[in-house]
């Protein structure tokens, strides 16, 4: 099965399934002599892992990462870095009732049609559990970006359902309280929105339903010049990486779809000797980073694994009514914050290495 790798010079390949023995990844291209241990990776995995909040799935996984290769005497060697996380809390019996049926809104049908076989246990390879290894690789990329270039990649939850954060609390990036973002269960920068999110998730769990979400990712201190026009534009690669995350249905760079109602006189980011006057473009012009903060917004669909009965068909194309059992997130966007950060960091590091190779 192709499509398991991302990047050219900094390349990440993941493997493993939701209910398999383990998840893993191979990282190629990280420069040598960077100090690295499991302790550098684990904090981001802890932000993503299940079973740590009443707002997310009840599946409990330690998500303890182990470095298998590419590190000697506490430093990267420049060779392939192998990482692995063992699965411990699989409950495959929850999925026996769907082994011959297709869950509406899931990848069951398309995987079966494409490959003629599928791992029905928790979605197999299509499960969001696969993203644990992206987060692990992204933590390494974030460390290198921060130490070598001062680049910070951070994200926050901006909306669940119809409930949005107060836009004034993020209008000035420099004033975002990132400590608060990382210390509340919703990764939300707006303290007034947290209790509203709490009430919404409680209601969804009682109803057995789910809701979509919107996240914002911000990369600061990105140098000018990253991006390879025309087909490897930085914004194109970021969109590709973010769209590859499970349940993501839309990506916006900068003002995104709001540009439709803007005039050119409003949208253009005017320049002065002291810098740009605005950042409607989201830090990317002509597919190349402008030196401004890179801003992306991503939309997550509501998960289809819900207790509300739905119509579907079985392997024999017979009509059925299905209720999805198991342990699932009422809003997958909550745990997606470190995943989004990871994908942006992976793309930025790849483009930084490509920039250095081409332009010195």
Swiss-Prot record:
Keywords carried by this UniProt record: Amino-acid biosynthesis, Aromatic amino acid biosynthesis, FAD, Flavoprotein, FMN, Lyase, NADP
Pfam families: Chorismate_synt (PF01264)
Known cofactor(s): FMNH2
First-level EC class: lyase
Any one GO CC term of the record: cytosol
Annotated cofactor note: Reduced FMN (FMNH(2)).
Catalytic activity from the UniProt record: 5-O-(1-carboxyvinyl)-3-phosphoshikimate = chorismate + phosphate
One of the record's GO molecular function terms: chorismate synthase activity
GO terms, biological process: amino acid biosynthetic process; aromatic amino acid family biosynthetic process; chorismate biosynthetic process
Keyword Lyase carried by entry: yes
Residues annotated as binding FMN: 125-127, 246-247, 286, 301-305, 327
CDD domains associated with the record: Chorismate_synthase (cd07304)
Record EC number: 4.2.3.5
HAMAP family: Chorismate_synth
Subunit structure: Homotetramer.
Protein name per its UniProtKB record: Chorismate synthase
